[in-house]
Amino acid sequence: VTLGYAGDASYFLVYGTIAEGLAQAGGTLAAQVKVARLLSQGEALPQAAMGWNAVGLNVVPVFNPSMGYVNYVVPAVFVLILHQVLLLGTGILGATQNQRSGRGEQGYWQQVPVLALLLARTLVVGGLFVLPVTYFFGFCFDYYGIARTAEPAALWLFTLPFLLATTWLGVVLGALFTRRDLPTQVVLISSLPLVFLAGFIWPLELIPTPLNWLAQWVPSTPAIEGFL
């Protein structure tokens, strides 16, 4: 007996659930048929049960105890949210100052050295995200029951370069535009491609090499790989 099934894999969550359910149902039906055949041949029930599956599989998940998408997808989404919001805020700040300078307005950003302005913006904007990082990686992880194997010190040691790189990328993004609405459009449009290029939803082996190379320049991509 051949059991065939097909589905639209573009809906990967629905497709995965349906495919797993059909595979389990087919395996159970095949086991029942084989056990019934062995019983009809005079085999005892314990021997017949062992006959169709002599080797048992004991799966022990290490990094994803629930074997679900919460432990796998949610942490990556948290990292992407932090990245996009920080990038958006820093980019809007820089673009707003460029827009005001274009109208002939004077501001503090024109009266201080570039390195001093960059240092101040890094400390202020990056420092503001200490609280969101604590909320996402602390309270939210505990609330959703997400497995966490890293020590707090190691987590912060990895978070620091992520915040620095994202802040500086936002500074570069803000310097490229003279209208404050443009960084918002760029960040929003880039969100979905960054999700698929990060490698936790779509396999990296199936992503074109040029796109994968470009994605490595965005802080969220190596950060998601490192956190997961």
Tell where the protein language model's regions lie, with residue ranges:
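Membrane-spanning alpha-helical segments of multipass transporters and channels
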Residues: G127, Y135-F139, A147-L228
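Short amphipathic alpha-helical interaction/hinge segments
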Residues: V33, R37, L86, G102, ...
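Hydrophobic alpha-helical transmembrane segments of multi-pass membrane transport proteins
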Residues: V60-C140
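Transport-system extracytoplasmic interface segments
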Residues: V1-G89
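Juxtamembrane loop-helix boundary motifs flanking transmembrane segments in multi-pass membrane proteins
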Residues: A49, N58, V62, S66, ...
